[in-house]
A protein has these predicted regions:
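Anion-binding alpha/beta catalytic cores of soluble intermediary-metabolism enzymes, centered on
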Residues: 1-206
């Protein structure tokens, strides 16, 4: 199991991505970020008040947080640019520029806009926010893969029973997003989970 984690980490290092962490002062998030920066796994963008983030890093002895890019949503130099982008994306839903300007300071929305604008590759959140709050801006801004209409999540389950999955490794979907999927949604969840198993674990789904 540790071997799999090491393989995933090495692949991440070889294809280093820019990842946004909207919950910039959440303890588990910040400690994980410090480890990622220490190991050189990814380039991180922390969202939040810089003074508060740095104070938390000092309190918890996280010496490598200084390697992250820290962005204050209230004072982002691209705030107006992102507000215009959000307004354009949501204009068919009747969003005004004033509404967009209010949302763009929300770290979850800002993170998705940073990705949509090509300034980052991904976002990780949910330690402090609900699944619904995390997914809402992602669906409004980033949207789903073409051809996929059902949003789903996948979990990596590592067991000590080699007879299950691939040497005890199972990829499970969907356990949190779509509560009562119909037949078509189940089919899409199966396809997406199989893709995740292949790309993350190197498993040939059966």
């Amino acid at each position: 199991m540790q071997r799999l984690i090491n393989e995933i980490v090495e692949r991440a290092k070889a294809d280093r991505q820019r990842i946004v962490l909207p919950e910039g002062t959440e303890e588990r998030t910040l400690k994980a970020a410090n480890q990622i920066l220490t190991d050189g796994v990814a380039d991180l963008i922390l969202l939040g008040n810089p003074d508060e983030i740095n104070a938390c890093a000092t309190e918890w002895g996280l010496g490598n947080i200084s390697k992250a890019t820290i962005i204050d949503p209230e004072n982002h130099p691209k705030k107006e640019e992102y507000a215009q982008l959000l307004c354009e994306l949501r204009k068919k839903k009747g969003m005004t520029i004033e509404e967009a300007r209010k949302l763009v300071v929300n770290p979850l929305y800002l993170g998705c806009l940073i990705i949509k604008n090509g300034d980052a590759d991904g976002q990780l959140a949910g330690a402090r926010n609900t699944t619904g709050d995390v997914l809402r801006p992602a669906l409004q801004i980033i949207k789903t893969t073409p051809g996929i209409t059902c949003v789903s999540g996948a979990m990596l389950l590592l067991t000590h029973a080699p007879e299950y999955g691939k040497n005890g490794i199972l990829v499970m979907g969907d356990v949190a997003v779509t509560p009562v999927p119909d037949a078509e949604q189940l089919a899409q969840i199966a396809v997406c989970t199989a893709r995740t198993a292949k790309s993350v674990v190197g498993m040939e789904p059966k």
